[in-house]
Design a protein with these regions (language model features):
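Catalytic cores of NTP-dependent nucleotidyl/adenyl transfer enzymes across multiple folds
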Residues: 1-48, 52-64, 68-100
């Protein structure tokens, strides 16, 4: 039930908990079969209003590597060096964008 989980986590973003963005990133990054397989999970519900709202919210929170979503991911991981922080922020942005482009 990955789609409802991602819907719930996306709805929770904005409550000041960096873990929500991290959980979204983790699921996308580590989904068995990759982001394409994860996107297939959305096929039966891609036109539902709640999924459209999720896409809009994720697109806003992860609009660039410097937006709130990637920043929250890096903050949650409590990284020390700037290079690692920038790499994680970039990866979080790219992972979410890959999913958004497929659903």
């Amino acid at each position: 039930a990955v789609v409802p989980y991602l819907i719930m986590k996306t709805a929770a973003m904005g409550r000041g908990k960096a873990k929500d963005a991290y959980d979204i990133y983790f699921i996308i990054k580590h989904y068995i079969g990759g982001v394409r397989e994860l996107a297939k999970e959305f096929e039966p519900v891609r036109d539902k209003n709640i999924v459209i709202e999720v896409k809009d919210k994720l697109a806003g929170k992860f609009a660039s590597e410097n937006h709130a979503g990637p920043k929250d991911v890096a903050d949650f991981m409590d990284l020390e060096d700037e290079e690692s922080i920038e790499m994680i922020k970039r990866d979080a942005y790219e992972q979410v964008q890959a999913l958004l482009n497929l659903i």
